[in-house]
Amino acid sequence: MKIDRLRRRREKRASHGRIGLGRVILMALLVLGTVLGVALATSYQSVTADLPDIDEMQPVGLGQNSRIYDRNGKILGYIAGVTNRTEIPLARIPVDLREATVAIEDKRFYEHGGVDWVRIVGAAVRNAMDSGGLRQGGSTITMQLVKNLYDPDAPRDFSQKIREAHLAQEVERRFTKDQILAKYLNGVFYGQNSVGVQAASLTYFDKPVWAINLPQAALLAGLPQAPSAYNPFVNPKDATTRRNVVLQEMADQGHITQAEADEAKASDLLLKRGRTYERKREGYFFDYVRQELIDRYGEQRVQNGGLAVRTTIDPRLQRAAEQAIAGNLGQEGDPAAAVVLIDARTGYIRAMATSREYGKDSQFNYAAQARRQPGSTFKTFVLTRAIADGINPYSTVYDSRPIDINDPRWGPIQVATYSNSYRGAVPISQATLASDNTVYIQMTLDVGPERVVDIAKKMGVQSDLPVVPSIGLGSGEVTPLEMAAAYAPLANGGFRVKPIAMTDLGTGIPKGDLATPKRTRVFQDGVAYEVTRILRDNVTSGTGGAANIAPNVAGKTGTTDDYTDAWFVGYTPR
């Protein structure tokens, strides 16, 4: 009996002791909570007192890749930037990805007003008990959005969390939950230079985000917390573990069933390294457009401005140009070749092709960058100058003979024909069909080399040209693009047109006179008619016979010494 009473007294004292200890712990927690609450309120007032209204703050421009399209609206490629980003509306983002993101990042997203105070206090307590610095996050999706848009480089301390909390509440008052989620999903970093879900999906799965499945959505949702650590290309095991955590959270929160979660967990990562932001069609033309954009608007605007550039390139004509090259100079060891097609009325570049496949080892654009001597194709400018001066090409006769003179202005001049055959007295028209060098050197001296250069420049040649008698025989260096543009006035009745590669930059972006044809009259249409008449005969019965493939084709061949370069510049009059 005595022993029982002693046992009961000890148990009673122990019970009282446990109750007392519980009360002490409870009181301590209440005191700690009160202190933290007061401290939080005081800090909140202190930090937010001088904060500007969010409308007065300038959000960071996230930017996105500019895109280049052909004339029909089919994409040629993306212009690479420091990061890749393509903004899309929330409706194109799968529900699975939205729910996965909310489940792992902010499960009370649809319940709070921008700040999850329970989560923040919990994070503060854990970090206070873990020697100071803020290592465990209490940020909601809205707070993360605020940081990304307004304070991306701010320090990660408690004051900054309060600042983000205040601004997050302002954001919640101005935008709907769907708008906030869309901004977040389009602006968060997913690793591999990818910002936003579309860039991430194209990078990790090589498909647009609206085409991904549940396990892929869960993988993406898990990346923002630590993009490098969970990079599936580098750390597939950790990425799988993180993905499965996301899937389990989705199941626990009722977004999917446990069976769906288990099935998705059993799935492979389903990775496919995407090259969307690297791939490009018509690489030489693409680079030509990119450089022109940079020259006009600067590299930063071009890389991150989200331009949607509609170009002038015509896929059908581009294929025809490529096939023409491949059918004639497509074998290994063949010389390099280039073709440029320009609409003579507008200057729109419809095709730009070369014989070299575009790639890492070949990015030199023979069509726009290769300066070569044009040979006899330059005789057209001498002919145009002469006709514009009133010389009749049918009645004006020159002596076709070897030239070996010592000109008082230009010094010794020696010129022969390629075949070393001469016709004696011959009208200019016939000398053109025979591409007679001896006649054209005399014509160049008569009209003046400087005036040949002048008419060539006015018609569209932009390269520096030597003012020498041999300029009439093509001793200067020009690009195929320049020559195509310079022949355009002969096809359109006497108007110089500037080559145009782009017609539009996208909605809301002023394009100025970007696509407006720049037509400047350089000679009367009668001059164009007479030159064309002779160059048409040159195709039907002169040196340009190989180009006689359609009615009304006019043009001129050109060959340099030792056949180093061979040209044909032609057109159909409009």
Task: Tell what function each PLM region has.
Residues Y110-I120, V195-Q198, T257-E260, K360, ...:
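Short, well-structured active-site flanking segments
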Residues D130-P155, R275-R279, I391-V452, N492, ...:
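Conserved catalytic neighborhood of penicillin-recognizing serine enzymes
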Residues I25, S46-G63, N213, Q300-R301, ...:
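Beta-lactamase-like hydrolase cores
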Residues M1-I68, R108, A128:
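N-terminal type II signal-anchor transmembrane helix
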Residues A100-V102, D106, M250, A321, ...:
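Active-site SXXK
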Residues N65-N72, L76, I93, I212, ...:
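A short, well-structured edge-of-sheet supersecondary motif
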Residues T311-E332, V339-D343, M352-A353, G359-A368, ...:
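A penicillin-recognizing enzyme superfamily signal
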Residues G133-P315, R319, Q323, K457-K458, ...:
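Non-catalytic, structured segments within soluble enzyme domains
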